[in-house]
Amino acid sequence: MRREAGTWAIVILSIMSMCVLLSRSTRGMPMFARKYGVPCSTCHTSAPRLNETGYRFRAAGFRMPEEIGSASEEAFDILDYLSARVQFRTGATRSKVGRLTTTNHQTLVQALELYPFTGAWGGHFSSDIKITFFPVSSPPAAIENLYGKFNTGSQRRFFSARAGFFHPYDGYGAADGPATISRPLFQTTPANSNQSTFFQSWGFDEGGAEIGFDAGHTSIRAAVLSGLVINKEGEKFSATAGVLAKPSAGPTYGAPDFQIFVNHVLQPEGGGLAFHYYHGNLALPIAGTSNFFRNDFDRAAIYASYPLNQHLQLFGAYQYGRDHTSSHAAFSSAGTFVEAAVPVKRMTSAGLRFDWFDPARPKAGNEINGVTAYVNAWFFSQLRIVAEYQHKRTKREPLPMQTDDAFQLRVIYIK
């Protein structure tokens, strides 16, 4: 086991060092880079993480805030609204439960992502479309974004409204997309007292409508969302949402979900505060019967981040959740993460994140904790390499603890 751990460490350090040494300056999302002729660092700290310029560019409908209400004087070019990205993945995992150890090695095409007709149209309207194909996954395709947006106002204060299907929220700093592959555990793990509640604060792209207001360094968003539906294949239940949601196996209550998201920029290179609140409802199966019960649930999270200096940026967050069991008893869940990231070169960073999540606070011995080390490197204009190692421990009392180790390397090319 020590020899395996040493081999893993050598491989990880070698790949991370190679990524850092090869990294070069790069350009941004190609369709926006082509349109504005700017480098990627104009909008990103370590992509996909945004700085304040990039965040406001997205909030203003893929235009600079001062361009709201002004039609572009440049000739229309369809290539300014089209991009594509392909992801390759290789990795190895090892899982240990008691004395049983299993390993897996895999190399594959992870995803093909298309961004057709994404950008600003005139001075007020914009659209965002993202279609992802998964060659070896089920379902084989997902429509992650498919919405139209309207902005009006001035550079300092503007309103927005969008409708369609979109990612759960647009965060900044600690609430933004991570610079590594995996997200914090509390964003991607459902609460679970005696059964899964299925909802995750990230991972389901729902349909809905959202209104927003940006003033200075603060933005507020309120959304009404379609929520999730429970599906059943054989004896297994799952949840889907969005454009390609499957037919519901249980009742639908006709009550939409509701979300509020607030961002405040403290520092232009990723320092900020964010608050997220989500209220939803979902029909969950009652074990041993063909019946369902309604789970009214809530999630509330606060995020904070700040660059202490040019060589260290800190991120952290805490989320609290409340759900119900089939006996209508309420239970809570909670999770947190802290992360330290070190900028190595422009657009290239290395980091370490600690995660903790308790899917049911009243229940003893079921916590999950993990440590994730990563390097996020960009080079040769549009090529990104992400190397990640994660060690995770899951308590399952009275069963033995489960320990998972995973190394993953992503090679991502965007055009």
Predicted features and spans:
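Surface-exposed strand-loop-strand hairpins of Gram-negative outer-membrane beta-barrel proteins
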Residues: 75-81, 90-111, 239, 243-248, ...
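Outer membrane beta-barrel
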Residues: 51-52, 82-92, 102-230, 254, ...
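Outer-membrane beta-barrel "beta-signal"
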Residues: 39, 377, 382-383, 403-415
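Outer-membrane beta-barrel pore domains and translocons
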Residues: 87-91, 132-134, 166-168, 223-227, ...
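The canonical Cys-X-X-Cys-His
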Residues: 37-47
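Detector for outer-membrane/organellar transmembrane beta-barrel domains
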Residues: 253-255, 260-360
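Outer-membrane beta-barrel proteins
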Residues: 72-75, 120-122, 149-154, 215-217, ...
